[in-house]
Amino acid sequence: MAGHSQFKNIMHRKGRQDAMKSKLFGKLAREITVAAKLGTPDPAMNPRLRAAVVAARAENMPKDNIERAIKKALGGEGENYAEIRYEGYGPGGVAVIVEALTDNRNRAASDIRSYFTKSGGNLGETGSVSFMFDRVGIIEFDRSVASDDAVLDAAIEAGADDVISGEGGHEVYASPDSFHEVAKNLEAKFGEPRKAALTWKPQNTVSVDDETGEKLLKLMDLLNEHDDVQNVYANFEISDALMAKMGG
């Protein structure tokens, strides 16, 4: 788990630095529409849609926006979006995974490639860095839902693989195959989680100096600000001082 908290800080920084809340809501709505289109429009029967709705609620997305995004799928929207995973190396040889939902593959690929190039990195082929990450499900709860032992016991009973509890809350990890069942069981016990999603967790992290770290954070910002980009993952650690300096 080396560097995990730093990794989380980078992900949280993304949320705080979105220039406009509407941009974030747009991305959340896109995921909701696509999830509803690929499955049933009922979150209770569609695990991916359920996770998307949980993510939207965690960002205080209005209920009307969520319902409107689901209705778009019923109206035929959402089928034009392609799910694409981009992989490459950023400054310092740091591995980066970018998940996108786009209705224009050429535009998305061109933009993302240019971001990597401008930062001193390079976009690779699919599979070029994902072997350095594990695909896992993560379910997060607020610290107040239960004691560390209670969450651990419930997670083990639900079939989870790992639990990390700290001041920031409880994080429960599960394999992709068991993720939705684990999330369902834990939600029945503790209520709706603040996050439930499949993620790419770095197997190991690399420490970078402040100069490289600054370039990497700028690359993360560029990627996260792109309308088509849904998630960005990387395997680096930076100093707390630099994180604070960059607004983390």
UniProtKB/Swiss-Prot annotation:
Entry-linked InterPro entries: Integrase-like_N, TACO1_YebC-like_2nd/3rd_dom, TACO1_YebC_N, Transcrip_reg_TACO1-like, Transcrip_reg_TACO1-like_dom3, YebC-like
GO molecular function: DNA binding
GO terms for biological process, alphabetical: regulation of DNA-templated transcription
Highest taxon of source: Bacteria
Cellular-component GO terms for this entry: cytosol
Keywords: Cytoplasm, DNA-binding, Transcription, Transcription regulation
SUPFAM superfamilies (UniProt xref): YebC-like
Cellular compartment(s): Cytoplasm
PANTHER family assigned to the protein according to its UniProt record, in alphabetical order: TRANSCRIPTIONAL REGULATORY PROTEIN YEBC-RELATED (PTHR12532:SF6), TRANSLATIONAL ACTIVATOR OF CYTOCHROME C OXIDASE 1 (PTHR12532)
NCBIfam families named among the record's database cross-references: PRK00110.1 (NF001030), PRK12378.1 (NF009044), YebC/PmpR family DNA-binding transcriptional regulator (TIGR01033)
Family in the record: Belongs to the TACO1 family.
Official protein name in the record: Probable transcriptional regulatory protein BBta_6910
Taxonomy of the source species: Bacteria, Pseudomonadati, Pseudomonadota, Alphaproteobacteria, Hyphomicrobiales
